[in-house]
Amino acid sequence: MPAAQHHPSTPDGRYFVVRGRLWRLSNPHLAPDVRQQLVDQLMRARREAGLAVKAGDKEAERRARAAVDAAKHALGERGPVWWDDGAPDYNRRLVANTPYAAWYAALPAGDRD
């Protein structure tokens, strides 16, 4: 099994970076057991989506993708931001086009993806 990839997280803990793009992290204020239940739901929905695609079942795929979206919203990875300081959301934006650009550029090359 390949080693887990490391993706750098922003200093404020709001995002991680994959191929130069910011992705919102889960809400760190979720209770560990709640977070685990939501992650389990997310993984189950992702598996169901993959099976539906392989089976060519468009309705099952739609339901599974809706379940993925619901789990991601509950985790805080989509929808309203989980922080309350009024900072804007840069989810899915290129890090180079955000206030995190200098931080990312300063990372050692081996820490960038």
Language model: regions and residue ranges:
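Extended, charge-rich alpha-helical interface modules
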Residues: 2-113
